[in-house]
């Protein structure tokens, strides 16, 4: 399968740079997996699409202000993007500099260069950085960090992004990108879903900066997926098994929830799904056998990204590309701050041959 099979024309004007004034007021394109039929509506239509007893699975990760600016003590500006927090004093990060710092290099971070840190080791493309400060890593990031808006949102981060680029139910700090499908849920909508009898469960997947890395190979099968930490606790496993047992659907909110659930299913030894507390490198593309997820709420993804491949594996390649073509024609807003899709599973997707 070729990466170019997942390309589509997207006018620059359709990339959303700010979210809708009201979270749940975005548009919703519904794709019926088995037939490919499309329905245009509003995000709150989700209320009518879910049944009492259906299980919504959210990702409760919280985005950290992961972008830091500063310089090497020896001179030369640097930009640091935290990939993950290792402990209270250390981070693993991408560093942009005219010349990469060497182990032992002293870094002065923050717009006022008030934070002192040391680059202690290099692991491939990533740098280990230790803060020489009394405060915890999270406190330091909250005080000097910038929200790591995706590269295609072409503007500096603003104070408002600290909440806008965060789901209302976010709880566990550690992501450098928001699980964006969740951005459309506000408290009134969550309340109405609960009142209808829709069940809710929360996994945690700390989205890494790798989510924005382009696929740099021609053939999909050659792509090495980045690694992210995921937690699927026992209560989520119980909720999934209970929903399946009573004939209800498991609906993943976002591709990160999909990857968490399907990773836990892949690692399970005895049951359909078992608890998972581990890094995952799961790469879902056409031909993948889904085991857990029956429906998906997701945003519109970048051409040739691993995420449009995941959706194609779920709804079917042809149905997915047709939906994206319609979305462009109907001027839906794309990417992190854009509109959403509701997609039901297409069991025939696994048999589809792509690019032949």
From Swiss-Prot:
Metabolic or biological pathway: tRNA modification; tRNA-queuosine biosynthesis
GO molecular function: S-adenosylmethionine:tRNA ribosyltransferase-isomerase activity
Main location: cytoplasm
GO CC aspect terms: cytoplasm
Compartment(s): Cytoplasm
Superkingdom: Bacteria
E.C. code: 2.4.99.17
Catalytic reactions on record: 7-aminomethyl-7-carbaguanosine(34) in tRNA + S-adenosyl-L-methionine = epoxyqueuosine(34) in tRNA + adenine + L-methionine + 2 H(+)
InterPro entries: QueA (IPR003699), QueA_dom1 (IPR042118), QueA_dom2 (IPR042119), QueA_sf (IPR036100)
Enzyme class: transferase
PANTHER family: S-ADENOSYLMETHIONINE:TRNA RIBOSYLTRANSFERASE-ISOMERASE
Sequence similarity: Belongs to the QueA family.
Quaternary structure, from the entry: Monomer.
Protein name: S-adenosylmethionine:tRNA ribosyltransferase-isomerase
């Amino acid at each position: 399968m070729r990466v170019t099979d997942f390309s589509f024309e997207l006018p620059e004007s359709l990339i959303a740079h700010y979210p809708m004034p009201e979270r749940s007021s975005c548009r919703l394109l519904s794709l019926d997996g088995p037939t490919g039929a499309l329905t245009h509506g509003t995000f709150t239509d989700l209320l009518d699409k879910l049944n009492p007893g259906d299980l919504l699975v959210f990702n409760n990760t919280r985005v950290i202000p992961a972008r830091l600016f500063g310089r090497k003590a020896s001179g030369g500006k640097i930009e640091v993007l935290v990939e993950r927090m290792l402990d209270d004093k250390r981070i693993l990060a991408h560093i942009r500099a005219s010349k990469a710092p060497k182990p032992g290099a002293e870094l002065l971070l923050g717009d006022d260069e008030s934070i002192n840190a040391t680059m202690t080791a290099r692991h491939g493309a990533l740098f280990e950085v230790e803060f020489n400060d009394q405060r915890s890593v999270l406190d330091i990031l909250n005080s000097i960090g910038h929200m790591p808006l995706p590269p295609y949102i072409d503007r500096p981060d603003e104070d408002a992004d600290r909440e806008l680029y965060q789901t209302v139910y976010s709880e566990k700090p550690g992501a450098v990108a928001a699980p964006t499908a969740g951005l459309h849920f506000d408290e009134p909508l969550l309340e109405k879903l609960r009142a209808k009898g829709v069940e809710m469960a929360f996994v945690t997947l700390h989205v890494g900066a790798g989510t924005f890395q382009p696929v740099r190979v021609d053939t999909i099968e050659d792509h090495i997926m980045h690694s992210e930490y995921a937690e699927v606790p026992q209560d989520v496993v119980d909720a999934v098994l209970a929903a399946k047992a009573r004939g209800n659907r498991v609906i993943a909110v976002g591709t990160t929830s999909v990857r968490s659930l399907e990773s836990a299913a892949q690692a399970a030894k005895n049951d359909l799904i078992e608890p998972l507390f581990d890094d995952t490198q799961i790469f879902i593309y056409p031909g993948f056998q889904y085991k857990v997820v029956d429906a998906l709420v997701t945003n519109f993804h970048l051409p040739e990204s691993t995420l449009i491949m995941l959706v194609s594996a779920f709804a079917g390649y042809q149905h997915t590309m047709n939906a994206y073509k319609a979305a462009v024609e109907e001027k839906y807003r794309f990417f992190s701050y854009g509109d959403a899709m509701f997609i039901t599973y297409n069991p025939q997707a696994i048999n589809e041959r792509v690019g032949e």
